[in-house]
Amino acid sequence: MNSARAKRIDIISDTHGYLSPALLDELKGADLIIHAGDLTSEMDYEHLCTIAPVRAVLGNNDYYRDYGPDVDRLALFTYEGLKFAVAHYREDLPVGSVDVAINGHTHVTKEAQVGRCLVLNPGSASYPRGTRGPTMARMLVKDGKILSTNFIDLE
């Protein structure tokens, strides 16, 4: 491993066809973008792919025909030595077998440690629920370790 620098992962969900200027500005410089479902726009997916590599999953408002075979209901992958699982619904995540489990759907931020697994919901970057405005999450990783995780308010 021994990468030269920490990698920045920007984590978003539930954009529902709207990528705000504030969100697009925050995503500049990301090494990887993770989208936890409900993109609802093929053009938005293509736009995100011009910013950084994207790992995305289908939400309850997405359809297979929109994004092709690389986007499914569950994404399992290793990045910088960490095992990731991404699904729109929390109950679809194999929390016991990964280092980081990411979900969306609730439009509310949440971070919890479950055993050795960090479970993260970035909230909604476009249509939040609850008292917090639009949000995303940012994670810095290097050599199999999470260096930091934080939520970013997009207002």
Language model feature labels by segment:
Residues 13-17, 37-39, 60-62, 89-91, ...:
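Active-site metal-binding loops of divalent metal-dependent hydrolases
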Residues 35, 59, 142-144:
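Juxtamembrane helix-loop transition sites at the ends of transmembrane segments
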Residues 1-8, 13, 138-155:
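Acidic, histidine-bearing metal-coordination/catalytic regions of metal-dependent phosphoesterases
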Residues 55, 78-149:
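Conserved beta-sheet core of the metallophosphoesterase superfamily
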Residues 1-54, 62-73, 132-135:
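N-terminal active-site segment of His-dependent metallophosphoesterases
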